[in-house]
C-alpha cells in the first residue's frame, strides 16, 4: 500500500472528505475519485509509532502509545496493535502481572486450559499469579478461558481487586473509567483497555520503578 510522506508531519490516513472526518479503511481506485491525505505535525519528543493500525488522530492514540512505550501492553505483532479487537482474559492477566513487576510465582494453577511450556511461560505465570492473588478466577469450572473476551464489568472488577491487593485508592476518584458506562456487559477492546489502563496509572499516581525481579513495577512513590 502506498503511504505518502511529508517532512515534519505524520500521515494519519486517507479520507473521502476535505474535512477529514470520513476515513477510508480500504482504498481501491477504479475510476476518477478525489481522496484527501490526513496529516498531523510530528512530535520529535515522542517515540516512534510502530503500529500501522493506530493513527495520530485516533481518540486512543495517546493511550496506546503510553501503554506500549511503558511496556504495559504490546502489539499482537511488531506492527499491529489491533485496537478494535477484543482484549482476552490471558492478555489482561499479563497486563496486571507486568504492572505488579512480574513477581516470582511459586506453585501451579489448577486450570486445564493454560499450559506450561515453550512460548507460554509468561502467560502461565501471569495467570497463576492472578489466580493466587484473587485478581482473576476460573470462567467455567476448572477452565480459565484464556482466549475469552472480557466485559467492562469484569475489567472494572479486576481493576478494583488489583487496587485492593496493592493498597491503592479504591474510590471512584482512583479507579479507571468503565464501570459507569451504560453497556457493562459489552466486551472491551484492546484500545479501550489501553485507555482505562492509562487512566488508572495517572489517577493512582503510579510511577515505574525497578522491581527485585529486574522487571518494571508500577507503584506510588515513597516520600
Regions found by a protein language model. Name each.
Residues 40-59, 74-124, 132-190, 199-223:
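Feature responds to low-complexity, polar/acidic, surface-exposed segments characteristic
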Residues 68-69, 127, 131-132:
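Alpha-helix C-terminal capping/helix-coil junction sites
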Residues 1-65, 70:
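Secondary-structure capping and domain/repeat boundary segments
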Amino acid at each position: 500500500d502506498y503511504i505518502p510522506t511529508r517532512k515534519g508531519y505524520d500521515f494519519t490516513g486517507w479520507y473521502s472528505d476535505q474535512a477529514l472526518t470520513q476515513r477510508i479503511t480500504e482504498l481501491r481506485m477504479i475510476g476518477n475519485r478525489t481522496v484527501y491525505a490526513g496529516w498531523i505535525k510530528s512530535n520529535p519528543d515522542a517515540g516512534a509509532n510502530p503500529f500501522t493500525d493506530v493513527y495520530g488522530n485516533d481518540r486512543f492514540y495517546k493511550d496506546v502509545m503510553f501503554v506500549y512505550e511503558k511496556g504495559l501492553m504490546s502489539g499482537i505483532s511488531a506492527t499491529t496493535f489491533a485496537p478494535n479487537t477484543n482484549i482476552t482474559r490471558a492478555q489482561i492477566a499479563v497486563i496486571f502481572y507486568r504492572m505488579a513487576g512480574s513477581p516470582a510465582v511459586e506453585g501451579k494453577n489448577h486450570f486445564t486450559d493454560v499450559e506450561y511450556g515453550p512460548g507460554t511461560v509468561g502467560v502461565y505465570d501471569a495467570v497463576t499469579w492472578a489466580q493466587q492473588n484473587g485478581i482473576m478466577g476460573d470462567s467455567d469450572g476448572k477452565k480459565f478461558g484464556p482466549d475469552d473476551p472480557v466485559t467492562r464489568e469484569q475489567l472494572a472488577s479486576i481493576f478494583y481487586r488489583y487496587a485492593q491487593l496493592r493498597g491503592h485508592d479504591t474510590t471512584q476518584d482512583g479507579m479507571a473509567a468503565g464501570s459507569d458506562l451504560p453497556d457493562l456487559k459489552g466486551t472491551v477492546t484492546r484500545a479501550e483497555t489501553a485507555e482505562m489502563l492509562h487512566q488508572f496509572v495517572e489517577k493512582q499516581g503510579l510511577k515505574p520503578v525497578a522491581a527485585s525481579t529486574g522487571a518494571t513495577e508500577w507503584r506510588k512513590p515513597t516520600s
